[in-house]
Amino acid sequence: MLEALGLAELAVLGFASYQDVKTREIDVWVIALLFPPALAAAYLSWSAPLYIMSPILGLVLALAMRLTGSGYADSLAIAALSLFPPFSPALPTPAVVVLGAGISVLGTSIWLLLINNRRPCRMTLTQKFTHICVTREEALKRSHRYIIGEVRDVEKYKPPERIEGDYVVARYGVPYVAHMALGFALYLALYGLVGPP
């Protein structure tokens, strides 16, 4: 039963990921659909050893993500995923999801470095891993993908209407829900191999 709930959750995450990659906006109803399978998994797992550690860690992570400027969808997704039981008391579910997402984000960072090394913008080494050099036209056409300037909260970001110069250095708006979907797929694979505690 937990495997079926996990696959249902992954299907919803897949659709949310599609929306996140395409527009960087996820419909509220899609995020709401993450909770029925997660709550059912929580109900079935409540008595598992140290189960409560996963939801607690998930809520702490969700709060930390929101306080550091991540979008509401990212925070709510990690909160929902944390309701799934850990396959090991030593590895709460959100830790596995974040680890898997981190591997995916590392791949994105390497991709950004390779792209930026061939583009004309002057960037620090750190920026080459976290930002992207794009043409003015691309930045204006797909403003949902690129964050220009200092932004503390992505929910309140308003793209500029004009950009000076032919190229601009922008923070790449990482679709973190898509990375979490890959992290949750890793969790499901490990859960299938190891099984419940």
Give the ranges of each region predicted by the language model.
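A membrane-topology feature that recognizes alpha-helical transmembrane segments
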Residues: 1-197
